[in-house]
Each structure stands twice: as C-alpha cells, then as structure tokens.
Amino acid sequence: MNKLQLIDADTLYYKPLAHPKMLIDGVLSDGLAILAGDSKIGKSWMVLWLCLQISRGEAVWGLPTRKTDVVYLALEDREWRVQQRMQELTDSPPENLRFGFSCGQLGAELEGQIEETLREFPTTGLIFLDTLQMVRDNASAKVNAYAQDYKDLSGLKKLADDHGICIFVVHHTRKERDSSNNEHGICVALRHPIPPYLPIRKGRAPVTPLKGCDIYADSNRGNQCAGL
C-alpha cells in the first residue's frame, strides 16, 4: 500500500509555486477547458477564431492573449471546410497553427499521439479537441455516462497538467436539461473538478457564461464569470 503524501500547512504556505500560465488573460489558463453547447450553433467557428487569435497573440474579447503554437484537431470536419472557414476569417494564416483531422481513441492511441506532437512541436501551448464524442469509447459511455465523462476528462486534464499546456475540449450538450437549466451529463459531472467550463446555448441571449478556478475576468467585459 502506498503511503499518503502529505504536506503541512506552514510548508505549503511558504512553498514557491508556479501559477497557471494564462492564454487569455483572466479567462483561459493551462489545464483542461470545456466549450459546451448545442450542435450547429457555431462552436467550431469560435474555436477556429480562437486558434487564429491565440496563435498570433492577438486579443480575444478585448483581453490580451499569450502567443503560442496551437494544434486544432477538427475531427468532425474535412480539410476543405476548415479551409473555407479560415479563408473567411483571415488573409494571413499563421505558421504556428497546425490542423489534424483524425486521431486515435481516448485510452488507446490519443494520449501517445498528443505526447509525440509535443515532442515534435515543443512550443505548443494549446490543443483543441473537436469533439469529445469523436475520440471516446461510446460503448462504455452508455454503461455509466457520469463515470465515463469523469474518467475521460480527468485523463485529459492530467495530460495537460503534466505538460503545462491547455487541452480545450469541444462537447455537444444533450437536449435534456435539469431543473436548474444545466445540460445533463458532462456539464453536471465535471462542473467542479475540471475548469474552466464555457456553455453556449442555442436560442438564448448571446452570453457565454464562464466557470473555472482560475477565471477572474470582470463580468462587465461581456462574460459572466464565476470562480469555483
């Protein structure tokens, strides 16, 4: 049996620790992030725009960004569709933004593929995974959706934390909602342990609520922010 690794309060209080590196000031840091919303409402457009802005170090929602290499795994799209979107969004594609259109499954090849990518492109600081459903074991998810959501994203979070990067997961929310207007499944299962969480809903006010441990952006800047 492995012994619990404990640290006393005084040691922790004075221990020099690195703070999370922000990619979008006050909104997005390294670790795991989730963009959740109904299908066909423009999540992939938003992700591509974020890729372009952050890879060039340009502002997002009026907030400063940290320039870094970006990988976008656009698993639900083909090359021509992403090309078309990019041509509408920019005239100068950044060289430090890279795309992938297929990858292995979670718990099988994906983690190794991400680590190999980080070895090949060590300045990568952000990886978008669009969408979670394309890389997970759907058979296992049907057995216990809550537990599978937690397992899948906890593994990705550890991978992001170990390498000091941000893995940004795009997820289609389910149509059913609970009594507090939250989508069932991943949003409920991971609201607390996996920051930050950005839900986007169809047919409602154009607001993107942000929730996460490291989010401190002023809500007057156009986002609803709450630290957990």
Task: For the regions a language model picked out, list residue spans one by one.
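Conserved inter-motif catalytic segment of the P-loop NTP-binding fold
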Residues: 2-4, 10, 18-19, 24, ...
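Hydrophobic positions on the alpha1 helix immediately C-terminal to the Walker A/P-loop
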Residues: 46, 50
